[in-house]
UniProtKB/Swiss-Prot annotation:
This is Endogenous retrovirus group K member 11 Pol protein. Coiled coil: none annotated. Residues 642-803 form the Integrase catalytic domain. Disulfide bonds: none annotated. The lineage of its organism: Eukaryota, Metazoa, Chordata, Craniata, Vertebrata. Mg(2+) 2 binds at residues 469, 582. One of its GO terms (molecular function) is RNA-DNA hybrid ribonuclease activity.
Length: 969
């Protein structure tokens, strides 16, 4: 045919010759030669290596070489006594661009139509029949050394795919796939599976299979490939990809698990990996392997010791029994597939069937991501996972899905469960709850905890109401028909509250409504009845959650639990009852408050005398009007608190820069006083990465007094708290899911990313090739070069010297008290972009105010005269000529001696914004509509705006005292 003619050429003698296959070139990260020295070899191995090299040379697989590349070569002896040559290509693989897998997973033999005859072949030395591209051969050179260097070493290079090369499997798959493509096109009604160098052919009849195989032989030979004649299988049982295939059944090949080699985490990890690979055939539910999975917990070091427990030994025995007896079925290509979901213990189990024939099992992982995973959510996840598996196997959705739910429960799941909606998205088949009658599923251990039976989502009528509370001092309590205080060993308010809820569920054997001020405990109690509880390294937490689940499931009466916000001062019986529960656990706090009101003892003394936390003790002192201190500012609504000096307060966050690849996690820290930024790019955002970043910050910025972060796991872990404690650093977090509390660092993230984009798209910094180099250049620009609005120095200068050079520091200011809706006078401590920190007065805490709630203070004329006589200001006599006023100049103008027109700008049509007298709002003075024209006597002139020389003529008339603040509107 035409395709055959294209592949053949006619020589000058007239004989047909096979055109050599076209090699697939490799892509290299560098052309710089990689040379790894050959290590010495014992004489016996050296002789074997010479023999093997000569054999490969005769076959044309290698050739002599003078390449600047070199990889070590060695030999190993097989059980048969024969030697095998191997090349250590790790260094070369590191500079090869990976091609990626073409078959990410094994094909399932269950998709082979039942009763179809098979032929299975194995390609002989497949890698050695596929040529390397000519330009790539020199990269795979090796050296055979000489003993005592008594003669020159012999050097060769591979001409075919070497064993151990990174892309050899992918090139092999591509090469063999090209050879089989004409076979697939001509025999499209045959079922052909190809994996690496193993090929399976199935056809409806033997004659068609023989025709297909004959054509396949020719195509394989034309491609330069050879079939291993001793590995052709034509009769049952067939062995393919670890499975034993019969006419209708498929069984795993018989193996025995060696238990004496199971010593370390790595040993068990490999064992469970192998078992998981054949579990879809064995049908071992997740609950039946829980003890084996539990061995993987603990130390993550691969060489850490592990012990095979008696329970895990029984589970291994079960696996061995299943290997001996388990089987699945080949499919009927004309019949649809169905998915059955069984409510088994621990997690649901899925089974793909055709009629009543088992095709494959499906399971969920033993470990979950969430602390509580509802059983209904697990069913939905398993449905979505298995639907994708069925589509991958046969290209179609299952015809029917059978679930352990009633029609009404399915309807409610579509309404209320997001996981259910995702798992069944775009499914157009049948959802049923009638299982086929067969004995193959009877061994499964079922659970009845699919949907909640005891927990209610709405308040119960005619039921008792109980309020719970817990304290970090270890006390738990509840109030209601009766009161009870429980002493717990926990130093966590949430855990104490959890004990309170468990106690209520145990003490009240009747319908109850529970009200708690812990949202975390409420959500956990709502979900725990049907949830799979994720294992935690915290044994106390595991015990509490398991006890809570057992308590809920043992109840005979329903309950409802809801959340109430604590300390809201709202009217009503719910708030009052919750406060009563609070009082039961906070008696020590009340006594501490009483002692401080009497003696004003400091926070350390309160913590030493009473069972209160540091935060509670500090709050008592800070809320005392006699004990307030200047360096503990309160937070005004709408403003992020800043530090009042370098390293007083940092904000820290993790942002993502996708262009950095593996190092896309960029940890960012900003000093809220100086706005000095430091960032490091890392491979993750766990606690270890955060600590690594902070140590880098300490080396550059110093050690802070306080750090504020979000509520990410890396910042809330015990390891991170211990790290901060060692460095004597205070730590606070913002409100969960509310980024406004981290506004400074969030804005810094945006600034840093913008700078990176500027450098990448418009910079001339080709030497910055790595992510950290790009980051360092951006940080240098932002810290040492940029000067921001309202500042006269860089962030680095401010951070190192502690000087901000703000023109308004120390000046009087009007600030708006949003709580009382009044304007008060204060003194500016620091002034930044869009914010200021103001001291309201002596013995009062500073407040952070948005600049939109600030106005410049205008002192009475008497105070102005006194200040003019004591401060370095320039006295000026009244005159008709303009007075030159510079930025930040202060000029006291004496009163006039005659009557003139009201004050106005010399420039036509301009206006002056003037504050009159004391505690009055600013008014507009000038010719424009709406401006007043008051008479004036004296005023102090200041020009706070950045502008060139301002020339004004001031006309003096008798009247009230005022001071103008010049602002062009």
């Amino acid at each position: 045919n035409k395709s055959r003619k294209r592949r053949n050429r006619v020589s000058f003698l007239g004989a047909a010759t096979v055109e050599p296959p076209k090699p697939i070139p490799l892509t290299w990260k560098t052309e710089k030669p990689v040379w790894v020295n050959q290590w010495p070899l014992p004489k016996q191995k050296l002789e074997a290596l010479h023999l093997l090299a000569n054999e490969q040379l005769e076959k044309g697989h290698i050739e002599p070489s003078f390449s600047p590349w070199n990889s070590p070569v060695f030999v190993i002896q097989k059980k048969s006594g024969k030697w095998r040559m191997l090349t250590d290509l790790r260094a070369v693989n590191a500079v090869i661009q990976p091609m990626g897998p073409l078959q990410p997973g094994l094909p399932s033999p269950a998709m082979i139509p039942k009763d179809w005859p098979l032929i299975i072949i194995d390609l002989k030395d497949c890698f050695f029949t596929i040529p390397l591209a000519e330009q790539d051969c020199e990269k795979f050179a090796f050296t055979i050394p000489a003993i005592n260097n008594k003669e020159p070493a012999t050097r060769f290079q591979w001409k075919v795919l070497p064993q151990g090369m990174l892309n050899s499997p992918t090139i092999c798959q591509t090469f063999v796939g090209r050879a089989l493509q004409p076979v697939r096109e001509k025999f499209s009604d045959c079922y052909i599976i190809h994996y690496i160098d193993d090929i399976l052919c199935a056809a409806e009849t033997k004659d068609k299979l023989i025709d297909c195989y004959t054509f396949l032989q020719a195509e394989v030979a034309n491609a330069g490939l050879a079939i291993a004649s001793d590995k052709i299988q034509t009769s049952t049982p067939f062995h393919y990809l670890g499975m034993q295939i019969e006419n209708r059944k498929i069984k795993p090949q018989k193996i025995e698990i060696r238990k004496d080699t199971l010593k370390t985490l790595n040993d068990f990890q490999k064992l469970l990996g192998d078992i998981n690979w054949i579990r879809p055939t064995l049908g071992i539910p997740t609950y039946a392997m829980s003890n084996l999975f539990s061995i993987l917990r603990g130390d993550s070091d691969l060489n850490s010791k592990r012990i095979l427990t008696p329970e895990a030994t029984k589970e291994i025995k079960l696996v061995e029994e299943k290997i001996q007896s388990a089987q699945i079925n080949r499919i009927d290509p004309l019949a649809p597939l169905q998915l059955l979901i069984f409510a088994t213990a621990h997690s649901p189990t899925g089974i793909i069937i055709q009629n009543t024939d088992l095709v494959e099992w499906s399971f969920l992982p033993h470990s979950t991501v969430k602390t509580f995973t509802l059983y209904l959510d697990q069913i939905a996840t398993l449905i979505g996972q298995t639907r994708l598996r069925i589509i991958k196997l046969c290209g179609n959705d299952p015809d029917k899905i059978v679930v352990p739910l009633t029609k009404e429960q399915v309807r409610q799941a579509f309404i209320n469960s997001g996981a259910w909606q995702i798992g069944l998205a775009n499914f157009v088949g049948i959802i049923d709850n009638h299982y086929p009658k067969t004995k193959i599923f009877q061994f499964l251990k079922m659970t009845t905890w699919i949907l909640p039976k005891i927990t209610r989502r709405e308040p119960l009528e005619n039921a008792l109401t109980v309020f719970t509370d817990g304290s970090s001092n270890g006390k738990a309590a509840y109030t209601g028909p009766k009161e009870r205080v429980i002493k717990t060993p926990y130093q966590s308010a949430q855990r104490a509250e959890l004990v309170a809820v468990i106690t209520v569920l145990q003490d009240f054997d009747q319908p109850i409504n529970i009200i708690s001020d812990s949202a975390y405990v409420v959500q956990a109690t709502r979900d725990v009845e049907t949830a799979l509880i994720k294992y935690s390294m915290d044994d106390q937490l595991n015990q509490l959650f398991n006890l809570l689940q057992q308590t809920v499931r043992k109840r005979n009466f329903p309950f409802y639990i809801t959340h109430i916000r604590a300390h809201t001062n709202l009217p009503g019986p719910l708030t009052k009852a919750n406060e009563e529960a609070d009082l039961l656990v906070s008696s020590a706090l009340i006594k501490a408050q009483e002692l401080h009101a009497l003696t004003h003892v400091n926070a350390a003394g309160l913590k030493n005398k009473f069972d209160v936390t540091w935060k509670q003790a500090k709050d008592i002192v800070q809320h005392c009007t006699q004990c307030q201190v200047l360096h503990l500012p309160t937070q005004e609504a709408g403003v992020n608190p800043r530090g009042l000096c370098p390293n007083a307060l940092w904000q820290m966050d993790v942002t993502h820069v996708p262009s950095f690849g593996r190092l896309s996690y960029v940890h960012v820290t900003v000093d809220t006083y100086s706005h000095f930024i430091w960032a490091t790019c890392q491979t993750g955002e766990s606690t270890s990465h955060v600590k690594k970043h902070l140590l880098s910050c300490f080396a550059v910025m110093g050690v802070p007094e306080k750090i504020k972060t979000d509520n990410g796991p890396g910042y809330c872990s015990k390891a991170f708290q211990k790290f901060l404690s060692q460095w004597k650093i205070s730590h606070t977090t913002g409100i969960p899911y509310n980024s406004q509390g981290q506004a400074i660092v969030e804005r810094t993230n945006r600034t840093l990313k913008t700078q990176l984009v500027k450098q990448k798209e418009g910079g001339d910094s080709k030497e910055c090739t790595t992510p950290q180099m790009q980051l360092n250049l951006a940080l240098y620009t932002l810290n040492f070069l940029n000067i921001y609005r309202n500042q006269t120095t860089t962030s680095a200068e401010q951070h190192l010297t502690g000087k901000k050079n703000s023109p308004h520091e120390g000046k009087l200011i009007w600030w708006k008290d949003n709580k009382n809706k009044t304007w008060e006078i204060g003194k500016v401590i620091t002034w930044g972009r869009g914010f200021a920190c103001v001291s309201p007065g002596e013995n009062q805490l500073p407040v952070w105010i948005p600049t939109r709630h600030l106005k410049f203070y205008n002192e009475p004329i008497g105070d102005a005269k006194k200040r003019a006589s004591t401060e370095m200001v320039t006295p000026v006599t009244w005159m008709d000529n303009p007075i030159e006023v510079y930025v930040n100049d202060s000029v006291w103008v004496p009163g006039p001696t005659d009557d003139r027109c009201p004050a106005k700008p010399e420039e036509e049509g301009m206006m002056i914004n003037i504050s009159i007298g004391y505690r009055y709002p600013p008014i507009c003075l000038g010719r424009a509509p709406g401006c007043l024209m008051p008479t004036v006597q004296n005023w102090l002139v200041e020009v706070p705006i950045v502008s060139p020389i301002c020339r004004f003529t001031y006309h003096m008339v008798s009247g009230m005292s005022l001071r103008p603040r010049v602002n062009y509107l």
